[in-house]
Regions:
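N-terminal glycine-/charge-rich "phosphate-binding" loop or analogous flexible N-terminal tail
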Residues: 1-43
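Glycine-rich Rossmann-fold phosphate-binding loop(s) that bind the pyrophosphate
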Residues: 8, 150-151
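Short beta->alpha connector loops at strand-helix junctions that form conserved
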Residues: 28-29, 69-70, 86-97, 172
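Rossmann-like adenosine-cofactor binding region
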Residues: 41, 52-58, 174-264
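Phosphate-binding beta-alpha-beta segment of Rossmann-like dinucleotide-binding domains, i.e.
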Residues: 86, 92-144
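N-terminal Rossmann-fold NAD(P) dinucleotide-binding loop
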Residues: 154-155
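NAD(P)-binding Rossmann-fold cofactor-contacting core
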Residues: 163-179
Length: 302
């Protein structure tokens, strides 16, 4: 079996040598769209995080299996792969703790104003007339936390939010989730929460879900966190309203990645941006590779 990794750089410094047990392994750190076909045309198994595998590539290669090194599968033409008899696997559940942790890191930064206090302590505290310096910050206890997308990550965030004393409500993007532990509400009610966190996939129901028609419902001093996909929140509409309304946002995902230089969110004051790293704790990446290996091993041995 010939295995080809197309974008190993996206996995960081994780050891991939275990895959040598399954056959000949070729590792590319990055792959441009124009390079994909040449690199995989004679491969049996392709491993990709974000490199696109489309109809043309499938028609002109010998691939038998595509292992997506992520949960989202938007980069592969799944319907055509099925027609061609190509097995496609993803990895689910590996990043739940990592994404939940960054969600709370962003929320707690806004709630506790850590960046402000760090700067003050380093530059002004020594000249203070009293032992402290106070600007308003708030507790999570008693706040309403609205979740958009109550999948594995959404449920984990809900559990942790409850530990902080939050009242958790959620909006089902599929319309099918009826979790009995938390109150299911309409989107407009979620957007009136003190904290709103997005954990849903990008699909026809969630694309442009938050836009100028409903972002105005977010209250002053509330917090919007997007850990789902960039296209769920209209970035232009958010940029136009967030500072005027006086709420805050934390985004780990963007409509175009890497983020473009003209992305309107780059000019927003009340926002924290991270480069799509919520999934990528060391432990999560190690788990990802182990689960991907098990998928490929099973395919090879069948």
């Amino acid at each position: 079996m010939k295995l080809v990794f197309l974008d190993a750089l996206t996995l960081g410094d994780i050891d991939l040598s275990i895959f040598k047990n399954l056959g000949e392994v070729k590792i590319y750190q990055t792959t441009k769209p124009t390079e994909t076909l040449e690199r995989i045309k004679n491969a049996d198994i392709v491993l990709t995080n974000k490199v696109v595998i489309d109809k043309e590539i499938m028609d002109n290669s010998t691939i038998k299996m595509i292992q997506i090194l992520a949960t989202g599968m938007n980069n592969v033409d799944l319907e055509y792969a099925k027609q061609k008899g190509i097995i496609v696997k993803n990895v689910a559940g590996y990043s739940t703790e990592s994404v939940a942790q960054l969600t709370f890191a962003m929320v707690l930064e806004f709630m506790n104003k850590l960046r402000y206090y760090d700067e003050y302590a380093k530059t002004k505290y020594s000249g203070s007339e009293i032992f402290t310096h106070i600007v308003d910050f708030s507790e999570l206890n008693g706040k309403t936390w609205g979740i958009i997308g109550l999948g594995n990550i959404g449920k984990r965030v809900a559990e942790i939010a409850e530990c902080f004393g939050c009242n958790v409500i959620y909006y089902s993007t599929s319309g099918k989730n009826n979790n009995s532990k938390y109150k299911r509400v309409e989107l407009d009610e979620v957007l009136k929460s003190d904290i709103i966190s997005v954990h849903s996939p990008l699909n026809e129901k969630t694309n442009n879900l938050l836009n100028k028609n409903n972002l105005h419902l977010i209250k002053k001093d509330s917090i919007l966190i997007n850990m789902g996909r960039g296209g769920i929140v209209n970035e232009k509409d958010l940029a136009e309203i967030i500072d005027k309304k006086g709420f805050f946002a934390g985004f780990d995902v963007f409509t175009s990645e890497p983020i473009k230089k003209d992305n309107p969110l780059l000019k927003v004051k009340n926002i924290i941006l991270t480069p799509h790293i919520a999934w990528a704790s060391k432990e999560a990446r190690e788990k990802l590779i182990q689960l991907a290996y098990e998928n490929v091993e099973k395919f090879v041995n069948e």
